Amino acid sequence: MKSELNKIEHYLIHRDSLNKEVSKVAVAWHLDHSLKVINKIYDSLKDSNPDMYKNKFSTARTLSFTFGYIPRGKAAAPLSVQPPDTIMTADIVSQLVEAREKVRKIESLDDQSNFKHPVFGQLNKKQTKRFLEVHTKHHLKIVKSILKE
């Protein structure tokens, strides 16, 4: 995740770039959303009860995690991780600092720490780390497409 967080920082200078053929929202939205997801999911893992984790098979999760792919435009972000209408660069920077710290701290959590994803179901720590990687890369690919890189 260190590489992905560095890319988020790199793309900050393009925060206002928009290409409506690729995405309805600007680069800043994708950066802010990605960081909100990392930070909120870490909090969910930290606050979870490891004894409540139950492994359950999910075809969608298996395919997404195996291929490292999330289809574009198929799911809407939950309100809790949607950026505000006005996204401040300073807010993205502070979320980036927070995300770097939380990514470091995730290793110290119990392996059965968990959070419930709306599509993939209950994820343990290992699965959550994979989700965060796949999800962040998904939004970074959209940013690259917006910028025509």
What are these regions (language model features)?
Residues M1-K2, K24-L31, D85-L96, K126-K129:
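Amphipathic, non-membrane alpha-helical segments in soluble helical-bundle scaffolds
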Residues M1-V27:
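Charge-rich, low-complexity N-terminal segments
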Residues I8-Y11, R15, I106-L109, I146:
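A short secondary-structure junction motif
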Residues H14-R15, A75-P83, K116-V119:
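A short small-residue
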Residues S17-F65, D110-E149:
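Short, contiguous alpha-helical
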Residues L96-H117:
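Active-site oxyanion/phosphate-handling segment shared across diverse enzymes
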